[in-house]
Amino acid sequence: MRRGTSIALIALGIASLLSGSSQAAVTVLGNGLARTCFLAAEFGGGSAEEGVKACSDALEQMALPVRDRAATLVNRGILYSRLDEPQMAIADYDKGIAMEPSLGEAYVDRGASLIVLSRYDEAVQDIDKGIAMGSNRLQIAYYDRGIAQEALGNVRAAYEDYKKATEIDPEFTLASSELARFRVVRRHSDGT
């Protein structure tokens, strides 16, 4: 399979990942619109449009603590990703990170949106930061970084990331499918 075709298929995989509920939402405690926004981002209940509205209403109508406001922006970003609006998603991730730079999930989620936009170097940097911060869904982070690494031509790094994702979550079929495409060839000590 040609590299361009492979990257296109990977982009479809990322798009399907973003359309599901596998991005890492940031928890908002209590009741109200911000909590509704979190539940829509985390569990995908209802339509993404309804979730975006709940998030927007929470941001406009509620006096949220800084962390909850940042989390609500990140959660709305996830919902924008599901609506195939990566630029809108990135704008919300940027605002959330500016308010609360310690949200590791925000970096991983922004990295996923950057992959959709073919901004692979930036995606790797963001995902690296999210991993270093201890993102709650490391298997997603490693999978996403593997996609970006493969798109950059860093095949060995991609393999290692897909492998790490399956070590963290052996049931993670997207990573297992990517890993299955690889063939490991051992080299002799003389380089052949």
At which residue positions do the language-model features occur?
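Conserved structural position within tetratricopeptide repeats
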Residues: 57-60, 64, 95-98, 129-133, ...
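Residue-level recognition of tetratricopeptide repeat
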Residues: 69, 103, 137-138, 172
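Register position in tetratricopeptide repeats
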Residues: 82, 116, 151, 178-188
